[in-house]
Amino acid sequence: MSEVPRIEYRTVDIDGVDVFYRQSVPTAPDAPVLLLLHGFPTASHQFRTLMHTLGDRYRLIAPDYPGFGYTSAPDDFDYTFDGLADTIAAFVERIGLRRFAMYLFDFGGPVGLRIADRMPDRITGLVIQNANAYEAGLSDGAREFTALSPDDEGAEDTIRGLLTLEGTRSQYEHGVPDPAVLSPEGWTLDQHFLDLPGRKQAQVSLAFDYKSNVEAYPAWQAWLRKYTPPALIVWGADDPFFPAPGAHAYLADLPAAEVHLFGTGHFALETHLPEIAPLVAHFLDRLEP
């Protein structure tokens, strides 16, 4: 039986941003390290059950981005994906991560791949969960969303429509056969943070910047081909934004990647932790330190 892990909750100042993070303390001091990069509209809280499941065996570290969760949201922060990556890259340096794998989910894909491009020699492997890096992985709705411009009439209203409790909850429930397995604290806590002063404007800015990620897809694909990191791909196949073709598309650049699809939506960890956690553990055990 696995031991109950010690989980720590800390905050560190990164260039004027109070970055909150949670980390597990494994029993072995040289345990593999996995940096958990969350998505939208959530924060490190989304990894709580994974950390309690695997935290005794691995050092799992999950920061909240600026404007998300318990991390501060300065008005003058650069709410772009470059800005998020700058902060998390500085966070990696501050806490002294030298060799680590990354768990990329949703927004964690663009953030993590920017970090990987800056420090390729530190990356031991990638766990990729509904984190798209291919045109084939964009649904029609996602294509329309990423094409939004601040100059488009009604564009900001469209974005803000996703930032309501109804919009947040639907991201959890869409594609889930049995919503009874979903804990309501996920979308409830997400909405609490979205409703804090300044948070929705930060999300609007990030939404308008999302096209920068699509433009970067070819460069990220080239990075994957060049460095060929070990990869585990776990994917909610019924994700309304990033459907199953996005998972298979990685095989063009990472032909040795392991792919597992699950009959669920965007937040696959919320519904399929018992299936995904052992896959992550087996993957981490195989990585070179």
For the regions a protein language model found, what residue spans apply to each?
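Catalytic histidine-centered segment of alpha/beta-hydrolase-like enzymes
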Residues: T264-A277
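The serine-hydrolase catalytic nucleophile loop
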Residues: F40-M51
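Flexible "cap/lid" subdomain of the alpha/beta-hydrolase fold that forms the substrate-access gate
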Residues: M1-A28, V33, P41, I61, ...
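A generic structural motif
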Residues: D56-L60
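Adenine-nucleotide cofactor-binding loop residues
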Residues: P66-G69, G265
